Amino acid sequence: KFVAGNDFNYVTTHAQAIQSAKSYNISSCSSMAVESGDVRMSDFNVADIILGLEKNDPNSLGYYKTFSHSMQQHLRNYVSGGGRIFVSGAYVGSDMANEEERNFLADVLRISPDGRLRNNGGMVMGLGMNFGFHDKLNDKHYAATTSDIISPLGNAYCAMKYSNETSAAIAYKGERYRAFTMGF
């Protein structure tokens, strides 16, 4: 039996959640459209960066770096102009290994990778709620079988925790921009 569970409906899922607030218009594009300049991030108030399980894997047939050098530059420019970013991904910190990449995480997302979490039970708490996410392979939804533990830097703070009390999401509200990053 083949169990994949990824029907690539993440844009629809995120759009439906955003739409439920009844306050926002939604557009979507690929990271390649941003990196090539076909889409200008400055045209949007908020960018929802959905990374899922993207990571640089030498065994992969394609290049799936969480934040390519080009994307890092686009995001730096976007936040310097007051943009707001919402980032989610199971390798958001751990895939950024060299000094330049870690500086991007610190300067833009205001996070520091702090390890990986396995077999958490898929529970997160914070912002006045508790909820689960898929952390076991199944045929319905992609699963983040391991997640990033991320720590806040500077004026950022831990907004959500995994069930073992490690940090699952970091929020930052600066003078120029805002960022919210989830490690799952």
Residue ranges of model-derived segments:
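Helical hinge/lid and interdomain linker segments adjacent to catalytic or ligand-binding clefts
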Residues: 2-103
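Sequence-pattern detector for short linear motifs
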Residues: 4, 143-144, 181
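Short, conserved catalytic or adaptor-binding loops enriched in Gly and charged residues
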Residues: 16-21, 148-153, 172-173
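Short, solvent-exposed polar/charged micro-motifs at secondary-structure junctions
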Residues: 36-43, 126-129, 167-170
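A glycine-rich, often tryptophan-bearing local segment used as a flexible ligand/cofactor-contacting loop or short
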Residues: 56-164
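Short, surface-exposed beta-strand/loop micro-motifs that present aromatic residues
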Residues: 147-148, 163-178
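Active-site-proximal beta-strand elements of phosphoester/diester hydrolases
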Residues: 158-159, 176-184
